[in-house]
Amino acid sequence: MAIAKEDILEAVSSMSVLELNELVKAFEEKFGVSAAAVAVAGPAGGGAAAAAEEQTEFTVNLTEVGANKVSVIKAVRELTGLGLKEAKDLVDGAPKPVKESVPKAAAEEAKKKLEEAGAKAEIK
């Protein structure tokens, strides 16, 4: 007696997640396969270099405070929304990241504001 596809689908749809997990493991053992997703082949040749060039998130690091510490603290507060004490601690602890995981335009704007305040900053 053959089992119809509809019967199998009905049985699977009524299973709990735990039962489905056990079913998948049984299929893996019985047929010697893996339920892992198939990896898609990337572009040949310079694919890794192109991926490295297209960085989308950047970190702005405060490297040096400079002579006008008060202006730098104000700039840090404006950029981060930190309170006065937190901004002062960040500036005193330089070199430290000021903004992390931001788009390139936002990183460049933050660097510009810090440099206008008299600090030295870098984008990574």
UniProtKB/Swiss-Prot annotation:
Keyword Ribosomal protein: yes
The protein's name in its UniProt record: Large ribosomal subunit protein bL12
Lineage, highest ranks first: Bacteria, Pseudomonadati, Pseudomonadota, Betaproteobacteria, Burkholderiales
GO BP: any one term: translation
Region ranges (Disordered): 94-124
Known role: Forms part of the ribosomal stalk which helps the ribosome interact with GTP-bound translation factors. Is thus essential for accurate translation.
Quaternary assembly: Homodimer. Part of the ribosomal stalk of the 50S ribosomal subunit. Forms a multimeric L10(L12)X complex, where L10 forms an elongated spine to which 2 to 4 L12 dimers bind in a sequential fashion. Binds GTP-bound translation factors.
Organism name: Paraburkholderia xenovorans (strain LB400)
Record's keyword annotation contains Ribosomal protein: yes
